[in-house]
Each structure stands twice: as C-alpha cells, then as structure tokens.
C-alpha cells in the first residue's frame, strides 16, 4: 500500500513539472526574436569553356578561347520581423587568341533586407547592388563579359526606404513612403569620362476615404523627388506632383467628380530656356460610374494652366478607369494632358493557373540615375535569386503574390539606358507573357521605349522582342533556348546621332543534372549587329557577328 501511494505522488509531481516546463516554450518564443530565426548559406562554382569566332568590318576575323570561373555565395536570414539576402559572385575571365592573352575579374553583389516591427503598419527596407551595366545604347543586348566588355561600367546603387500603411479604418486610410538612394558608376571606354554620381531623396504618399464613406469618395496623392548631381552644382533635378479627386455620390452608382492636378519639373541653378521650370496645373469636373472600389470609370472636362504658352488655358477631356473584370484580370487606365501635351497610362494584368501576362504603358520625366534606382518590374515568373534561366522558375498563383526573401520577379526585358543622366521624357510600352505547364516553361516579351532628350533636341527609340523556352526532356535533362531582337533608331538636330541598328542575340543549349549538386550544359550562341548607328568607340564597330560554343559545368553546395 505504501509503495502504491508513493508511486502516485511521484507521478503527480512529474506531471506538474512537465506542465510548467511546457508553459515556458511559448513564453521563450515570444520574448526571443531569434527563436524562430533561420539562416541559410549556399554556394556554387561555375566553369565555362567558350570557343568564339567574331567577324567584323573593322577587325576582320578573330578567334578566341575563353575560360571563365565564377564562384557564387548566397546567404539568407529569416525571422518573425527581419528577413535579408546577400548574393555575391566573382567572375574570372581568361582570354587567349593566336597572339596574346588577357585576364579580367568582375566582382558583383546584390542585397536586400526588410525589418517589419509592426506588421501591416510600418516596415523599413534596404536594397542595393554592384553590377556591370552596358553604357552603349547601340550595343543593347550584345554586351557581356565575353563580348563588348569595354561597354560595361561598374555601377553601384543603394536604397533605403521606410513605408507606412494605415488601412481598413472607418474614415481615413493613409499610405506613405520616404526613401533615399545613391547611384554611382565608373567610366567606360565607350562613354569616356562620363560617370554617374547622384543622390536622390523621395517622398510620396496618398490619403483616401475610409470604409464608412458612402456619399463622398475621395483621394489625395503627392510626390516630391530631388536628385542631386554630385558632379555638377547646378544640375539638381527636382520634380513634384499632386493630384486629387472627390466623387459626390448622387445615387448608388453615379457621382459628380471634381478633380485637380499639379506637376512641376526643374533643374535647379540653370535659367536657360531649355531647362527652365516646367509647371502644369489643371482642374475639372465630370461624372463617375462606380460599382465598388475596384470597378469605376470617370470622365471629366478639364481646364489647364501651364508655363508653356501652347498648353496654357486649354480645355481637354480626362479619363480615369479601374475595372476588375474578375479576380484574375485587372484593367487600369488614365488619360489627360501634361506640360508636353496629351498623356496617358494604362495596365492590364491577367493570371490563371498556367498562364500569366502583364501589359503596361507609362510616361515619366526622369533620368538615368532614377531609372537605375527605381526599375520597373512586370515580371511574370518568380525565380530563385541568381537564376540565369527560366528552367528553375514558376508562375505565381495570384496577381498579388509576394516573393520570399530568396525569390525575385524576373524582368525578362530591360530598358536601353544611356549613362549621360540627361533629363528625358520616356514613353514605354512593356508586355510580359509567361506559360508554365507540365514540361514546358515559355516566356515572351515585347518592349517599346521612346526617350525624348528635353534639353538636347534628340530622340531615341528602342523596339525589342524576346522569347525564352525551357523543355524538360527527362527527369535530369532539359532543352533551353532564347532569341532576342532589338531595333534601335536615333535622331538628332545636328544628325550626329542619326542612324539605326538591328541587334540579335540567340542561344540554344542542352543541360543535364548529375546527382543533387552537379549540372553540365552545352550551348551555341549567336550575336549579330548590323546598321549605321554607332557611337564611334565600339571595339567591333556597327557591323559584326559573334558565334560561340560553350561547355559549362556547375557545382552547387546546399
């Protein structure tokens, strides 16, 4: 009997202790920010042997054997409130021809971090990169470490950003962003001593009505950006804009709209007519048909007030459209006038299980540093950071998909940018299409951009088309192909930059995975440039053909 009673007491005591110890688990997890933290470190080494044959009018026939070795390191950190990623590569290039050899090294990195102390309220972000970018717009699609490396310039960019979001309130919702970015580059052979060195400060935000608003729907938006040119004290580029509207509801679906807009662009410290401040204001009234916050169309009659005499006191019709056709399809559009005349913006997005597309058209007054610091991304594929093909990518299942820290939306086309930091009016149309089903991953891109150099009286147009295909032949073997084409046209008052260039970049290759860590591939690449558009400093001139055969081996450490 005594033994039985003692045993029962011991079991009761152990049970109490176990319950107490279990209580400490959630308490420790709550007070320790690293309790759920995860740190991952991976790496890879890639080696390429490239046989290259180049034919050009200026250099004749040139045969090269090139060896590249590229080690890469990827480090990521995740916790409840912090996530970050750093990826770095070092590319060693060793070229040999019949008469001489050449060795070069290119170090690159990219990083991103986000701290969210208050979810859906406040977050801080940091991002940046060190890359080698093409500086010769006539060599668009054709410059890399192997060919036209003299057109590359080491470019650094860093951005710090704070975001505030106050939403789903009864009367007022608020969204705001403050950011600082710096962009700098070294010179290249093709651009001479021209280099970027700019700091940008930007604030933008919006205030809208809350959920309780029934008879008055309103919105106010504003933005200010100052880009300081550290190479020149009289070239600070300042822009500001503000616009707002109010819909006074007359019935369940119809409302009277009043609207106003302000815009100003100026290069401070310069008073010449080409760069004087361009200020434009407009106001108007009209009607709105609204079903809900994602389905409305508004038409207004507006009056303008501008520094430009030809655009002052003009009447014009404005359009504002937002219409969700379904949970998979969204259409946005806006039409009106700005200081340069008629202006429009539009976007269409569609997403299904295996097909995703995005089409956008926009106009902005900007320069090279701003384009590099805030790139447009309409990527329809999500890929691991550092991925070079779409074979490892996938289609997100939602229009609002947010990539994880080690993922990124891949922009399959890029803008053709000149590194002179002139103020330009850029109009661009960008189409991205992706398909992912079974063994096939396919992507198509179409990009048209027009750069109007406001203080140089010259124009550049770029039309580019591209297609990428990855076909899984078997469990370990895939066929990859890419073809890209660009037509570049230049016009200038003195005819010094007039001309046209047709650029081709095509690749087909076969890759095979061996085990969990090793991958081999064999590919053929074809590059071609023809036309009469050249800046005069290109190594191979304006007409040349480059053919390559590449054997590649990649080892990945996980």
Task: Give residue ranges: language-model regions.
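Cleavable N-terminal export/targeting peptides
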Residues: 1-40, 390-403, 558
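Gram-negative and organellar
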Residues: 36-558
